[in-house]
């Protein structure tokens, strides 16, 4: 009886998703930041380059189909659940598992077969091979985990997924710290015996790869355990299915693939630029520099991408994805006011994440200060990547990604090959990618919603407010670091920048006294706005 009550509803007695998802996202972000910091700190910039050059390749394979398939399965299962077609929902799960296994077998086999070609064209050198082989095994576990995550999301069970994600990332952080340290020590011994410079860095990258793999495997196991725990609940759902309609598994597989491909192509365009940039960098610079110096330079760039840019973009993607279905439903039903509210909220979340990480960037070297601009542009690109497919513009998102990637490749070739700017050329290429993506995305978005949504208040003015705030944060950070310690610098810059962002939104008529009163702590914000004279 107790178990029946416990499994009557997956979400029952759990905290609200509005509070739970951001809190868990923050915890995962901190764990990932800690993991990335451990990798860079224990392996050095050269070891980080060995690891991240492989990780970018595996990340493309992991996200393009498994992550996209998760979203498509969640939508399809939710529709069946609303119609009490739980057997068809289970059929979608089975089809997703089949697609995941086939995809994993194909991609893992291809990566094994073409590993030598990757080492000669994309990665640093042969020292990256073992790291590639270890991370390659992650694909199967991540694909299966994503399939079950989509099924849980479709049935409304976010809490088990969040618990499994926290468990997996916690194990990932601990395992990375242990194995990276262990393999670095073994690598130092091997380097002394073999007298081969740089061996310890390759060993450290292998240890980091084992830690990442352990975290993904544990997350997959935790999700399967959660599925087994709620098995009696799922069986009761099947008994409640009164529909006579049955869906053929082959037909479901075909329809899922047809829905996944345009979205997967959009994600592919967003993820390919780090791989292309590192390929151009290694092939261009390899003739004039040794592997250790190249790995050190690329490690500095990858440390920026992994620690300062990748994590906030990942969280921005998670928070923006949360609103995708609501925007899609509101757009189809003609509720453009709801679309505007949700889109504005997504912009706000992305900008807050970008600005928070930009403060850290402003305290570092010139390379990281360039990342301030790139992070804002890429964060808005992630927002458009979610918004365009949500309003049935997947092809526009794909075209936008192709054009942005082409601009990135051209810029990388000119800055790295012709102008010999090295890693600075790679960062300039990222800025160009984000700029082209944002401009084209806004153009397509404007055509889709022209006359139905106030684009000025929904997109243009928030972007302008964010740009004003970003410039102010950079200048404030540079000013305060002259006489304040880093922690006080961050706190002072955040507080003042929030005020600047608030004033900019009010002066550009994005927010009014009435809308502010509906915010969390709205009355306090309204009194503050009246005190500084921006509201009557």
Where are these regions (language model features)?
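Membrane-interface junctions at transmembrane-helix termini in multi-pass inner-membrane proteins
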Residues: 142-164, 373-403
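Membrane-interface helix-loop junctions in multi-pass transport and translocation proteins
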Residues: 159, 169-222, 395, 405-439, ...
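Signature of the first transmembrane helix
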Residues: 2, 10-71, 108, 139, ...
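Transmembrane helical elements of multi-pass membrane transporters/channels
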Residues: 17-33, 37, 212-219, 223-227, ...
């Amino acid at each position: 009886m107790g178990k029946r009550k416990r499994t009557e509803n997956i979400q029952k007695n759990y905290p609200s998703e509005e509070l739970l998802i951001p809190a868990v996202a923050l915890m995962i972000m901190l764990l990932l930041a800690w993991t990335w910091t451990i990798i860079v700190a224990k392996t050095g910039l050269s070891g980080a380059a060995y690891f991240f050059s492989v990780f970018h390749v595996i990340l493309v394979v992991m996200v393009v189909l498994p992550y996209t398939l998760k979203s498509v399965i969640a939508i399809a299962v939710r529709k069946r659940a609303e119609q009490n077609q739980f057997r068809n929902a289970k059929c979608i799960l089975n089809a997703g598992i089949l697609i995941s296994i086939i995809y994993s077998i194909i991609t893992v086999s291809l990566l094994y077969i073409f590993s030598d070609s990757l080492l000669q064209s994309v990665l640093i050198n042969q020292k990256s091979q073992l790291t590639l082989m270890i991370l390659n095994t992650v694909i199967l576990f991540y694909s299966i985990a994503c399939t079950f995550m989509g099924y849980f999301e479709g049935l409304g069970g976010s809490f088990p997924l969040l618990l499994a994600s926290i468990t997996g990332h916690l194990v990932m952080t601990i395992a990375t710290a242990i194995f990276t340290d262990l393999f670095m020590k073994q690598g130092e011994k091997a380097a002394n015996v073999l007298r081969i410079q740089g061996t310890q860095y390759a060993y450290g990258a292998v240890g980091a790869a084992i830690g990442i793999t352990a975290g993904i495997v544990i997350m997959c196991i935790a999700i399967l355990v959660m599925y087994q725990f709620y098995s009696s609940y799922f069986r009761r759902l099947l008994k409640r299915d009164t529909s006579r309609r049955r869906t053929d598994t082959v037909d479901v597989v075909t329809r899922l693939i047809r829905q996944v491909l345009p979205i997967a192509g959009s994600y592919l365009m967003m993820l390919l630029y780090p791989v292309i940039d590192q390929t151009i960098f290694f092939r261009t610079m390899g003739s004039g520099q040794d592997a250790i110096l190249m790995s050190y330079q690329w490690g500095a760039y990858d440390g920026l991408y992994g620690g300062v840019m990748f994590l906030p973009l990942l969280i921005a993607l998670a928070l923006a994805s949360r609103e995708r279905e609501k925007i899609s439903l509101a757009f189809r039903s003609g509720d453009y006011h709801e679309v505007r509210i949700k889109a504005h909220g997504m912009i706000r979340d992305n900008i807050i994440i970008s600005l928070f990480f930009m403060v850290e960037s402003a305290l570092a070297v010139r390379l990281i200060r360039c990342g301030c601009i790139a992070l804002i542009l890429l964060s808005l690109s992630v927002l458009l990547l979610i918004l365009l497919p949500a309003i049935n513009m997947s092809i526009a998102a794909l075209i936008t990604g192709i054009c942005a990637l082409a601009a990135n490749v051209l810029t990388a070739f000119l800055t790295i090959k012709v102008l010999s700017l090295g890693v600075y050329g790679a960062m300039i290429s990222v800025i160009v990618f984000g700029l082209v993506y944002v401009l084209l995305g806004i153009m397509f978005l404007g055509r889709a919603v022209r006359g139905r949504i106030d684009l000025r208040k929904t997109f243009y003015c928030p972007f302008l407010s964010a740009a004003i705030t970003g410039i102010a944060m950079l200048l404030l950070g540079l000013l305060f670091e002259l006489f304040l310690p880093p922690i006080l610098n961050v706190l002072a810059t955040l507080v003042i920048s929030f005020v600047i962002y608030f004033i900019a939104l009010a002066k550009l008529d994005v927010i009014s006294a009435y809308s502010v009163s509906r915010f969390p702590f709205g009355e306090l914000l309204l009194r503050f706005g009246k005190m500084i004279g921006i509201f009557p």
